[in-house]
Swiss-Prot record:
Family note: Belongs to the uroporphyrinogen decarboxylase family.
Subunit structure: Homodimer.
Naturally occurring in which organism (per UniProt): Helicobacter pylori (strain G27)
NCBIfam families linked: hemE
Alphabetical keyword list: Cytoplasm, Decarboxylase, Lyase, Porphyrin biosynthesis
Protein name: Uroporphyrinogen decarboxylase
Gene: hemE
CDD domains: URO-D
Binding site for substrate: R21, Q22, A23, G24, R25, D71, Y147, S202, H315
Subcellular location, record wording: Cytoplasm
PANTHER family recorded: METHYLTETRAHYDROFOLATE:HOMOCYSTEINE METHYLTRANSFERASE RELATED, UROPORPHYRINOGEN DECARBOXYLASE
Main location: cytoplasm
Reactions performed catalytically: uroporphyrinogen III + 4 H(+) = coproporphyrinogen III + 4 CO2
């Protein structure tokens, strides 16, 4: 698999490409599958439809890897927090974590309840071309914790940060509990058939450096270290969004570092490129315009050259991006990097 070879810095015929949120609303086929499911959460839980959606971008765009269609919040959902997705607003937990008692009441072994995810993986792997990789994923302990404490997405993360500074032992207990669940969750994804795993730390930028390293990065390192010990042949990709200023403190046992669009690739390559393969980092809105897209691709490829790079966006696909430009991006990267 070209994608897996690239994760391990092996020679590849061209630079592989996939896109975060490549299965999404910009595809009419996705909209149809979502309609059949009835709701976003039901789409995640319906393995047949989730498989359909996982495969769509591979078939339509020609990307080099599929990423499992699911949501990072299925883990806290199965730990006992009721979850709903409110149209135009996003996820909302009906209960939140407020004290040590609420952390202790969270179910242990929630990963055992996620058979619909593992079924999607095994179905997808059976239908996916042998040349294409399947990526599994989860959210980081910190990012999941913020949703569980705030109850929804937040601009200030005030409740989470208040807990971090005034009652750190409660937050640590939650992060520890989540980390143990996520290690087993990703292990079962690997056993079900994924070829690589990725951890999304979407709200990494909410924390100052010292707090980030202690309350997020340390837990990411713990998870990736255990996974590399169990499955050395499976690449681990970490994507801490918005921490370009902290790159000099990044270390750990993982293979690929995801670079967001706000972090210059030149800096990421200089600081991390010798140790980790870099993934990223085209600004997604460049896909609105072909000229802007071409300029962005040119800049990235000039910096990264032929090895140690997986092409991706620096954030997820937007719902109204033209699909023909997404397809063009894949063709362009393949053509420009063919060796």
């Amino acid at each position: 698999m070209i994608f897996i070879d690239a994760c391990f810095r092996k020679e590849t015929p061209y630079t592989p490409i996939w896109m975060m949120r490549q299965a999404g609303r910009y595809l009419s086929e996705y909209q149809e599958s979502r309609k059949k499911a009835g709701s976003f959460l039901e789409l995640c839980k319906n393995s047949d439809l989730a498989t359909e959606v996982t495969l769509q971008p591979v078939e339509i765009l020609g990307v080099d890897a599929a990423i499992l269609f699911s949501d990072i919040l299925v883990v806290p959902l199965e730990m006992g927090l009721n979850l709903e997705f409110i149209p135009k607003k996003g996820p909302h937990f009906l209960e939140t974590i407020t004290d040590l008692k609420s952390v202790e009441s969270l179910k242990v072994g929630a990963y055992k309840q996620l058979n619909y995810v593992y079924d999607t993986i095994s179905q997808t792997r059976q239908k996916l071309s042998k040349e294409k990789a399947l990526i599994g994923f989860c959210g980081s302990p910190w990012t999941l914790a913020t949703y569980m404490i705030e109850g929804e997405g937040s601009k200030s993360y005030a409740k989470s940060k208040k807990m971090l500074y005034s009652e750190p032992e409660i937050l640590k207990a939650l992060l520890e509990k989540l980390s143990l669940e996520l290690i087993e969750y990703l292990s079962l994804q690997i056993q079900a058939g994924v070829n690589a795993v990725m951890i999304f730390d979407s709200w990494a930028s909410a924390l100052e450096k010292e707090a980030y390293l202690k309350f997020s990065w340390d837990y990411l390192k713990k998870i990736s270290k255990e996974l590399k010990k169990r499955y050395p042949h499976i690449p681990v990709i970490l994507f801490p969004k918005g921490i370009g200023a902290y790159l000099d403190s990044i270390d750990g046992e993982f293979d690929v570092f995801g670079v967001d669009w706000g972090t210059p690739l030149t800096a990421a390559k200089k600081i991390l490129g010798g140790k980790y393969v870099l993934q990223g980092n085209l600004e997604p809105t460049r896909l609105y315009d072909k000229n802007a897209l071409e300029e962005g691709v040119e800049t990235i490829l000039k910096v990264m050259g032929n090895q140690g790079h997986i092409f991706n966006l620096g954030h997820g696909m937007l719902p109204d991006l033209p699909r023909e430009n997404a397809k063009y991006l894949v063709q362009l990267v393949h053509a420009k990097t063919r060796r």
